[in-house]
């Protein structure tokens, strides 16, 4: 793997090497390893999440070495550089028409894809539901048992290389039409109510205590979150700016499904 990594690094610094067969073979090998889950753009470590920049470089370099091709699926036709993912039956994945995933995205067994889209470099772990019109962007990392509700947008990131992708950890519930972009991390078992929008600059305010606690870029584990707003002064006057409010917690002690249902009911959260 070290040899492949060095080939990728050399090609990144010298694009003329993209004409060499050794380079193109190495790039395609990385994409194949991403496709089967043997490599990841980002992975959990004992010190938090680690971004593998060289893998992201391989994904970026994959585009210029590919040629446009017509892809025919029954009466439907596509024209693109990246092939579609295949072999769902053998992988134990349920795919409802017209869900689409690109080659180079890993999707684990027991996952359900309703009509949705999963981009190259993404990692979708076991037992996750990607609901209708949800999108999983390039290199996004989705954990086990996650529910991405209808119309959810999980942003992708290829560049800048050092930027972390959006990370949705295990057993998270993301409500309808939520958006998470710019490397936001939603930690284990958190619940996002419908229409929550999270960017790296979005204020996430914990209002469960006597005083508000502000944070950005991270939703703590088991938090129950709804959309909110705060007042900000501008030259033209005071206006409301969107934020996210932490209004409660899922209980650790109960069954995951039970704790989810209780959290939604107790906090009156729409999903």
Identify the residue ranges that each predicted region occupies:
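Terminal amphipathic alpha-helical/low-complexity segments used for targeting or macromolecular assembly
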Residues: 1-93, 222, 227-271
